[in-house]
Structure formats: structure tokens, C-alpha cells
UniProtKB/Swiss-Prot annotation:
BP GO terms, sorted: translation
Name of the protein in question: Small ribosomal subunit protein bS20
MF annotations from Gene Ontology: small ribosomal subunit rRNA binding; structural constituent of ribosome
Its biological purpose: Binds directly to 16S ribosomal RNA.
InterPro entries: Ribosomal_bS20 (IPR002583), Ribosomal_bS20_sf (IPR036510)
Pfam family, one: Ribosomal_S20p
Gene Ontology CC entries for this record: cytosol; small ribosomal subunit
Annotated PANTHER family: 30S RIBOSOMAL PROTEIN S20, SMALL RIBOSOMAL SUBUNIT PROTEIN BS20C
Name of the gene this protein is made from: rpsT
Length: 83
């Protein structure tokens, strides 16, 4: 447990950031899974879910949660599925 005041503050800040990052990643993964499930089932709203998944991937990459190359690779794979 940190003793220095600034280190104590950092622990609190990191905890908040970890929760925020985990929530963002979960949202991204859920959007991708929803699209894949809809595409496999041949649902009508697959194109809307595709756009939502791409948006979540871009948001995660821009915030540094995933590497930009991973986002691009995942988007490419989703686009291939969408065709």
C-alpha cells in the first residue's frame, strides 16, 4: 500500500481508469459478437450492427485500448464477413 500522497492518488486514478477501460473493451467485444451472430443467422439488421462494431473498434483504437493495427485487422475481417 502506498504511503506517499501522490502515490495514493495514483492508485485511485488507476482504479477508475481500469474500470473505464474494461467497460469500453467489453462494449467493443459485445458489438463485434452481436454482428458476427447476426451475420451467421442472416439477420436483417446485420449492416447496422456492422457499422456499430466498426465504430466501437475505432473508438477503442483512438483511446489506446487496442493497437491501431489490431483495429484495422479486425475491421478487415468483419468486412470480409459482411460481404
Amino acid at each position: 500500500m502506498p504511503q506517499i500522497k501522490s502515490a495514493i492518488k495514483r492508485v485511485k486514478t488507476q482504479a477508475v481508469a481500469n474500470e473505464r477501460n474494461a467497460a469500453q473493451l467489453s462494449t467493443m467485444r459485445t458489438a463485434v459478437k452481436k454482428f458476427k451472430a447476426a451475420q451467421a443467422a442472416g439477420a436483417d439488421n446485420a449492416s447496422e450492427l456492422y457499422v456499430a462494431a466498426i465504430r466501437e473498434l475505432d473508438k477503442a483504437a483512438s483511446k489506446g485500448l487496442i493497437h491501431k493495427n489490431k483495429a484495422t485487422r479486425d475491421k478487415s475481417r468483419l468486412a470480409k464477413l459482411a460481404k
